[in-house]
Amino acid sequence: MDYLESLDFPKVVEIVKKYALSDLGRKHLDTLKPTVNPWDELELVEELLNYFARWGEPPIKGLNDISQEVERVKSGSALEPWELLRVSVFLEGCDILKKDFEKREYSRLKETFSRLSSFRDFVEEVNRCIEQDGEISDRASPRLREIRTEKKRLASEIKRKADDFVRTHSQILQEQMYVYRDGRYLFPVKASMRNAVRGIVHHLSSSGATVFLEPDEFVELNNRVRLLEEEERLEISRILRQLTNILLSRLNDLERNVELIARFDSLYARVKFAREFNGTVVKPSSRIRLVNARHPLIPKERVVPINLELPPNKRGFIITGPNMGGKTVTVKTVGLFTALMMSGFPLPCDEGTELKVFPKIMADIGEEQSIEQSLSTFSSHMKKIVEIVKNADSDSLVILDELGSGTDPVEGAALAVAIIEDLLEKGATIFVTTHLTPVKVFAMNHPLLLNASMEFDPETLSPTYRVLVGVPGGSHAFQIAEKLGLDKRIIENARSRLSREEMELEGLIRSLHEKISLLEEEKRKLQKEREEYMKLREKYEEDYKKLRRMKIEEFDKELRELNDYIRKVKKELDQAIHVAKTGSVDEMREAVKTIEKEKKDLEQKRIEEATEEEIKPGDHVKMEGGTSVGKVVEVKSGTALVDFGFLRLKVPVSKLKKAKKEEKEESSAVSYRPSSFRTEIDIRGMTVEEAEPVVKKFIDDLMMNGISKGYIIHGKGTGKLASGVWEILRKDKRVVSFRFGTPSEGGTGVTVVEVKV
């Protein structure tokens, strides 16, 4: 039985095929089926995803489907010029792709596509022999050049003679012209003047008034032209055969290249699918856990992500709830994602998703239409279930939709429980949907099973499509009836007809749903608080950036003034030295006076500074000419280490003065100093836009704390976030280098950045 079809596997493959470059990739995708060892395919997909994130699309020049051309080569046919051009472009593309992968750091891609064979000699020969429009070039062979040269010379001679003939025989011609038909030059002679010239009549006009005549003097020339044309055709055929034989002599290499490009195109399509659907590569694991799994056949704007986890000590889920509530989509997604992962496909879900390998995936998917189904429908489902039960074992994943429906509810429930028990005894992992109460009760009491339900909003009388784990689903019949206005007396009468056990179960389920609703409300409140916190954090970071820019501008001004003063003194010293070497005594005296004056000014400055209060650790100070207030950390050898909050500077004591009280207070109101600092940040879940200010602040903090290396955790996923982070780092001049982490550092889920300190 083709269980994959019931899980929508072929439909998803059709979606992926739309992203392939050619039929080669599309055919390869059709060959992908679940296997117990999908590691090779998954690792290649993951590496190509990372390639896209870092380098963009790989070079894909001319990677078209040349299967028909290869078959013609195998059959012994000589390829036509346009076919040889297609093969040449394809093989040139193979060479470009191989060289590109050789210089990248992706070992699996490099190893796999290193087997592409180079056909450089063939490509060069085709480029030499065939023009881009498909015409055979004169360069193809010396003989072809000779033939064409002779043809041109002969054509020139014939044209000259034809022009002379028209001029000298104008009286017998219907028109002053000649035509070229079937490889011969003919003249339109008046029928009445037919015998005025010796020659062969080839055509007669429809009116009979004109004959198209080949004069005897042109017959030999035309024959020579026809002979040259035949020689040209034979020479071209020889050249095409020679080029085709190069391919025939390396047929195995050619076929291997086609197979490898088919595989590459298939990988390319899967990666494009992953990027379009925000997918990720899920490797085989020992558990089943879906994190925001999105069924690819449901439109993006309507799909509700599925979150589901089967603990290691459990072997199955019993999912209950009203029809059309999403039960079927949930269990199909588990089976579909398992089959896709085992076939080497990325999955539209978030990181953290885990799936097991099952050598057997079996499913019976029903139609969520009505509780009342025909006997024939029940029989067809039971036929599939019989086959599943017969083949199930500990290597099996079994998906059963609406088990027990289509017959008497009591018998159907008993049959469903018995089938579930048998599958569990055989060691199978099961995902079952039902609306039968006895099956819910059975699941609640079985140590290997978990109940789950599809959330239902009684206010809107509609499902939310969210999975509630640990809570069996109710029918909501009474709630719906009451909401729609049915008399309460009738509803109470209906309730009274339920057994005590049924009423207790209904009450328990209702109580659990109420608790879940309260928890969901708390979750929403926490989410709201988190959003408010993020807004405050963004505002704080923006304020911090403004403050830092302001401080840096102040220091830039002070440094410029200091540099100007140094340049002025240096210039005066240079002038003094020059005067000493070349000037007169008067000029030297003047230069000495200038230097003496500068010396006195500096000495006076030191005296004034010395009279001020001594600067010591703990003092609040300002730089000379500046407004930024900092705190002295230590004083050593006439130099103070001053903490300005956002950075620390070593400043000569002579360049500092104590701050006034009001300046201290202002400083304490705006100064910033991180209380603690970690050398890593986690930006998983953020968009590139959200991550940019966080990454830039992280670089600020690294530099302020004198740390040269940091770690940015962005996860693997589609690679969009990693690509965005690398673009941010590439533009930041403070960054010395960056790279993906080693396996021990987190691999491609982490970027290691080094900054200037």
Curated annotation (Swiss-Prot):
GO biological process, one term: negative regulation of DNA recombination
UniProt keyword Ubl conjugation present: no
Span of domain Smr: 681-756
Taxonomic superkingdom: Bacteria
InterPro entries: DNA_mismatch_repair_MutS_C (IPR000432), DNA_mismatch_repair_MutS_core (IPR007696), DNA_mismatch_repair_MutS_sf (IPR036187), MSSS (IPR046893), MutS (IPR045076), MutS2 (IPR005747), P-loop_NTPase (IPR027417), Smr_dom (IPR002625)
Enzyme kind, highest EC tier: hydrolase
E.C. number(s) listed in UniProt: 3.1.-.-, 3.6.4.-
Keywords assigned by UniProt, alphabetized: ATP-binding, DNA-binding, Endonuclease, Hydrolase, Nuclease, Nucleotide-binding, RNA-binding, rRNA-binding
Keyword Nucleotide-binding set for record: yes
Gene Ontology terms, MF aspect: ATP binding; ATP hydrolysis activity; ATP-dependent DNA damage sensor activity; endonuclease activity; mismatched DNA binding; ribosomal large subunit binding; rRNA binding
Matches recorded under PROSITE patterns: DNA_MISMATCH_REPAIR_2, SMR
Binding site for ATP: 321-328
Pfam families reported for this sequence: MSSS, MutS_V, Smr
Quaternary structure, from the entry: Homodimer. Binds to stalled ribosomes, contacting rRNA.
UniProt record similarity statement: Belongs to the DNA mismatch repair MutS family. MutS2 subfamily.
NCBIfam families the record matches: mutS2
Function summary: Endonuclease that is involved in the suppression of homologous recombination and thus may have a key role in the control of bacterial genetic diversity.
Protein's name in the database: Endonuclease MutS2
